[in-house]
């Protein structure tokens, strides 16, 4: 199959997802539609609507854009079917219902910013740095019912220096991931796409580290930990969302301080 014969629908929202979409467009792949989050209210009183980075890029390339509030909405599903996708690609979007990920004849694959099955979840880059890992990477895998558990198609590895913060690792994985997305599509075009169950990558589920969503309280520094753990914790949250601690003034007032 030739590049232009494969109809691709792309799904993503933040900056991390722009690089992969850009690689597909500039590589001459046939992106027939882009799905992203609805514009969100910003500014005073939410009077201004801000488009996602993916939407901004898609519009600049004259790509059709859909922004569903609900992924099971029949009107959206009808529009999605009308795009007649052969393949869907997901990068930093949201959990998809089966009616969506099972729609194309070649299925839907996701780019995840870890070496799956390690760090399944919403914040894999942060947790790899917080835990002091010396290596991470990116994985493409097929979507299935359980989040981040589908068969692995391909992986790339990235070393983490002990001076790297999460921003540095994020940007490196963003670039590496874009290359992996196009490589994965090429495997499909060449008829060489073999996917391996994640169970073949570990013996004991206890070996797996999760990557849950990070909340404000998660970012509070525990000064009772060893210095190395505190150092890794801070760089794993820098520059965003930022580790923090509390300063108590002589008068008893408290102030939160971000630590980078």
Please state what every model-predicted region is.
Residues 4-5, 168, 218:
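Surface-exposed, charge/polar-rich loops and edge strands
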Residues 1-45:
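N-terminal Rossmann-like dinucleotide-binding module
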Residues 40-59:
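N-terminal beta-loop-helix "entrance" segment that forms/cooperates
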Residues 9, 32-35, 64-83, 88, ...:
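Internal alpha/beta domain cores that form substrate/cofactor-binding pockets in large enzymes
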Residues 27, 87-210:
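Donor/substrate-binding cores of folate-linked one-carbon enzymes
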Residues 18, 51, 73-77, 94, ...:
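Structural motif corresponding to alpha-helix initiation and N-cap regions
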